[in-house]
Amino acid sequence: MQYPTISEYVKASQDASDNLDMSTEATNAELNEAIMDEFGVKYSKDGRKLLKAPQNLDSTYSIKEGTKIICDMAFADCKSLRSLVVPDGVTSIGKRAFSDCTSLSSLVLPESVGNIIGNPFSGWDGELKCLSPYFIYDNKVLFDKDKSKIIAFRDKKTTSYVIPDYVTSIGNGAFYDCKSLRNIVIPDSVTSIGDSAFEGCTSLTSLVIPDSVTSIGDSAFDGCSSLTDIVLPDSVTSIGDCAFFLCESLISIVIPDSVTSIGDCAFDYCESLRSIVIPDSVTSIGDGAFDSCTSLTDIVLPDSVTSIGDWAFEGCGSLTNIAIPEGVTSIGDSAFSGCESLGSLVIPEGVTSIGDSAFRGCGSLSSLVLPESVGNIIGNPFSGWDGELKCLSPYFIYDNKVLFDKDKSKIIAFRDKKAKSYAIPDSITSIENGAFYDCKSLSSLVLPESVTCIGDYAFYDCKSLSSLVIPDGVTSIGTWAFMGCSSLSSLVIPDSVTRIGDSAFWGCGSLSSLVIHATGAGIVDSVFKGCKSLESLVLSDGVTSIGDSAFDGCSSLSSLVIPDSVTRIGDCAFSGCTSLTDIVIPDGVTSIGTWAFSGCTSLSSLVIPDSVADYVNWAFRGCSSLSNLVIRATGASIVDRAFKGCRSLCWLAIHAKIVIPDGVTSIGDDAFRGCKSLKSLVLPESVTSIGDKAFEGCSSLSSLVIPDSVTSIGNCAFGGCRSLKSLVIPDGVTSVGEDTFSVCSSLTNIAIPDSVTSIGDWAFSDCSSLRSLVIPDSVTRIGHCAFSGCSSLTNIAIPDSVTSIGFYAFSGCCSLSDIIIPDGVTHIEERAFYGCNFSNNLKQELISRFGIEIFW
């Protein structure tokens, strides 16, 4: 039979699908409009693409019929997934689609698959069966149908491999994470090495790249930490981004004259690399190309180089000498930052631009001259460097160790590290990025009314700065502007400020009083993080959001009024505010982020308004004093770990129970885990799912009604609910998962509906008060240790539908003296009835059918 080529196949598929999108990427737009099935798997709204599966996807899953594309990373890290069915009809599978599905035992590629992007199977070692005529699977290696391209090398135990000489291309991620592979032979037929081709091959010690290879992809040898040396042939013209990133043992590499570009981070963290010669063909050194090459002592840059990228040699602490070629016109941000052994450096005439922090921390560099050609300085290139500076450029003024622009309207670098006080001249309108960086002696500073802008990290780590008045004309305070100003005790932010950058006051540990008059600035991410002395705070009306980690670790903050204008409270916004006793969330708030109030150990009461549409994982975790909770939000879900560890949580306002309002559809994983004082709970009819460990450890919970609307109860959902006496599982539930009711030691009876087909491992283990139980005819499997330790169980009927009983299933059921095992049971595992009080006759009967191992 003559099969079409892959390109012909894809074209035909496109024609048949009216040129619909064939991309394996799951776009944000698609994810936002996605349709979620009952297992939490997201599909595109037209059903053609499987976009993303949740990482907690468990047991068995069948991809829906009609699916054409399995997107990149679709099932990545689904570590509990044991079985997956890919239907015939799927045509494309994206990169790393099944990566790290460590419990998945096998997978079948159906005939319809004609397009595979990269290596979908990286980090997965299960059995693969290929039915597609467009690929060949031979000795654990997946090739295209012509065997010209290696797609996936899957023999993770092999220490050496010879690539066949008919292979011309090593695909993206083909040998990804083959940690046992020490030696590999690449034949002369190979012309390209793809992105991440050998990434994570930590045992690979040596490699010869043949003359036929012309390109080395991004991250091709990323993380090959045992690779000591490599020779690149003259045929190679480019070295991709991060190509040798984290090759920690790489001592030497020869770059041929054919190479014209060295990618960003190409040799980043090659900590053993001592010297390197860059050929005349190279014109640019990419961003981070030799970042953190801590053993690099010598490097020769050819005259052909015209630009040195950002962080190009950052952290090269052993580099003693480098000559910047005459042709270089730009030196990037942090280009030589942290080159602490660099004794001398000449900036050639011709350089026109120098980036921020370019020479930061060059402690051995005694002097530096700015040539006449320099007309553009970004931020402060000299932060953290105390050597002698001479300025020849007419575009700048260097006066009394302060570098200004030529008009003296901007302070670029304040370099008098011994100064304790300074009055900024009235002509200054802008304090540039890093201008006063690390001025540890500066305790007093006067800002004139003329200043309108305070740049990023302008006063970073000015540890002695104790007082500062921000003038009314300032409109912008940059990112990290006052970060680490640990002596700053009070501050007023005027209403002229329209922008405050992220982390602007992070680590201002002495800041105890703060007034924010600015209404349009917003409370941005990490802005006051770690301000551990901050006791009070006034926020003006007009603030609309409180950013991620905005007040994280403000351990002295006892009260705060959030203005009505706020609509969003970000992730970790008040995490670790251990003195915060009460807070009012205004009615306009629609979103409360992950960990938002986690660790607020003094918070005793809380009202969640009905405007809240979503509060997410861990939002109130560890609020150990929270005893009063009012949830008015009707459209939200009680999501993963929302109230985990709220051990004082027991009642709502006047009621002696927590009332979850109508409209809530799901109780997430760990939502109320560890709420030891929670006694009773009412779940509304709107709830359809209860997540893993949702009520685990709620040891006082004695009363609960699960509504008929619930179809899914997660693993260990009620584990350790020692006071729970009775429970009815609604008809829609199909399985009782692992540990779902384990250690419910007061549970005397439970009703299992006919809809349940399996009873999971440890499902009712150590339910020591459970006396009798009816297992419905729908159940086919009783899991491992399912009823182990049910010491009061005297009577149980196993239906004809059951075919298997797991090991230790009824071990320790010392009151169980009789049982009837139907003929349909074909397999009982070892010690299933260990410790049961059966008569000798019954034991002999069961031993004759299933072997003595079921008792021992």
Can you say where each PLM-predicted feature lies in the sequence?
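Structural signature of tandem-repeat unit edges
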Residues: 1-42, 48, 53-69, 78-92, ...
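Consensus positions within tandem repeat domains that build extended binding/scaffold surfaces
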Residues: 71-74, 94-97, 119, 151, ...
